[in-house]
Amino acid sequence: PSYNYARFLDACLSSILMQDYENFEVLIADGGSSDGSLEIIERICAQDNRFRLVSTSDHGQADAIEKAFSHATGEFLCFLNADDCYLCVDALRCVVDTFNAYPSIDVLSLGGYYLDAHGHWTRPIKYRYHPLDGFHLMRYRTAVLQPATFWRKKVSDEIGWTTQFHFVFDVVFFYAAYQKYSWLELPKPVAGYRMHGDNKSGFVKSPRINELVKFEEIKFGSHSFRVFYLIGIGAVVRISEKMGLVGRLLNLLLYKLVNLLAFASAYRLPGI
């Protein structure tokens, strides 16, 4: 998916072009960019017929991904946002070799690094930093490094994408995949997750909290404590959003406090 990230798009597409595994297709769904992204996409597509622009309008990121995957012909799938990239030339080869070596796995999740806005590696991404964390806690904390996660085509064909979600659609998808399919986690860092200040999931926003509430309802039911807990947090966030700079500082404090409590409770309390 691509939308007004022209400043990162070249790096994203170039990281795919440099792969030493050549049997791939790239299906690009642009949401109507007006910053020069389409010109970059059209140039790459003209240079290499493995790249195709399949959509120029959508109703959000999940809808864009669903449209793109409707054209997919490959056996293994993933999606890479326009502000992210692959870090090594053998990322796709590693994925194909691993799936072929382990025919019983359906989802493969690899490692990655945070990048700054200039593409510099800053620190490794560690989603399993709690001593008790693991796949057995996926119901409480669906921790998946999206740009480094790949799956067999049948997974998304059967699960589909919840297009009513805009902030947590990927988490909803991966949780559904966790419930039904076999997973393998490997530490090899293949993907860069770019932190540039405009990341959609990088802020505490009331619409995102609302979606997390709906996600908890899917997992635990509408009357669970986790649902009411997040509803209360959402109410505080909505108030702070009207308070300018003070509100932003309050949101930052709330973000740290809620996630600290989630960690301390081994994620029996939800994070945000």
Give the location of each predicted region.
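Conserved donor NDP-sugar-binding/catalytic core segment of glycosyltransferases
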Residues: 89-122
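A conserved acidic beta->alpha catalytic loop
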Residues: 30-39, 81
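Conserved nucleotide-sugar donor-binding catalytic segment
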Residues: 110, 116, 124-215
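Short, acidic, metal-binding catalytic loop of nucleotide-sugar glycosyltransferases
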Residues: 14-23
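Short aromatic/hydrophobic "clamp" motif used to bind/position activated sugar donors
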Residues: 77
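Acidic donor-binding/catalytic loop of UDP-sugar-dependent glycosyltransferases
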Residues: 36, 63, 84-98
